[in-house]
Structure formats: C-alpha cells, structure tokens
Swiss-Prot record:
This is Ribonuclease H. Monomer. PANTHER family: RIBONUCLEASE H1. PROSITE patterns: RNASE_H_1. One of its GO terms (molecular function) is magnesium ion binding. It comes from Bartonella henselae (strain ATCC 49882 / DSM 28221 / CCUG 30454 / Houston 1). Mg(2+) 1 binds at residues 13, 51, 73. Residues 4-145 form the RNase H type-1 domain. Pfam families: RNase_H (PF00075). Its main location: cytoplasm. Its cofactor is Mg(2+). The gene is rnhA.
Length: 155
C-alpha cells in the first residue's frame, strides 16, 4: 500500500534590523486542521540569511516526509532553490559571474532537507496584507524584539 504524504502549508519570512544586523525569521506550518508557529534569530546576520533560515527551520520541523506548499516573499529563496541551485553546484558553488555563492552552507542545508519532502515553492508579494505572510513577518520581528529586550532569542 502506498503511503499518502501529509499535506502541509508553510509561510515563511525573514527580517533584519540593519543589513547586516540583528535578524529574525518566522514560519507558520499548517496541516490537517493544526497549526504551529516557529521563530528564531541571529545576532549578526542578513535579511537573505533569515529568509533561508525560515524555510530551513520550518522544513526541519516536519517529522515525516510531507507534501509541502511553501510560501515566501523572498525572490532570492524561491529562485535560488528552483532556478539557480543546479547551476551553482555545476559551477562548483560559483555564480555565473564566477563569484562564490553567498550563504553556500545555508543553501546546502536547505537542499538536504528538501530531499525528504515534495515541495512546491510559491512566491507571494510581501507587505501587501496577505494574512499568513504578515503573521510570518510579525514572528520574525518578534524574534528581533525579544533579542533587544532580553539579550537572547527565547524561541
């Protein structure tokens, strides 16, 4: 009997106060009537790194192979995973202009976790009132605020 993959919707966002600076990421996972919020951050990071971390940490949180619709407002993440990654690997992790790919370790980690799931990547325009994108953004900003208030990330 074939195993039916659990269907999961994920909404992700990253934020950075200064670029580089203190950054946060947020993710909402929704499946079968359930929902989970995740967030975290880094002290010295970039917005693109936080966008990657949001997707990476959300996918790592899945405990079994799933069918995933992942929504991001980051063209960098969506294009990187679906258009640029194969070329980067073929070119020994260099861009078409022969420069080292930024955030190589995060891209490698994301590619690794993606291999366990069936993922459809979706781009949604950020800061246009999409409720789940706004919630993911609020979680990313919450991580930054908690760091500023407590000197650490609590999530």
């Amino acid at each position: 009997m074939l195993h039916q993959q659990k269907v999961v919707e994920i909404y992700t966002d990253g934020a950075c106060s200064g670029n580089p600076g203190v950054g946060g990421w947020g993710a909402i996972l929704r499946w079968n009537g359930h929902e989970r919020e995740l967030y975290g951050g880094e002290v010295q990071t970039t917005n693109n790194q936080m966008e990657l971390m949001a997707a990476l940490c959300a996918l790592k949180a899945l405990k079994e192979s799933c069918s995933v619709d992942l929504y991001t407002d980051s063209v960098y993440v969506r294009n990187g995973i679906s258009l640029w990654l194969k070329g980067w690997k073929k070119n020994n992790w260099q861009t078409v202009s022969k420069k080292p790919v930024k955030n190589k370790e995060l891209w490698q980690a994301l590619e690794g976790v993606c291999s366990f799931h069936t993922i459809r990547w979706h781009w949604i325009k950020g800061h246009t009132g999409h409720p789940d994108n706004e919630r993911a953004d609020a979680l990313a900003r919450k991580a930054i605020a908690e760091y500023r208030e407590n000197g650490c990330f609590s999530a």
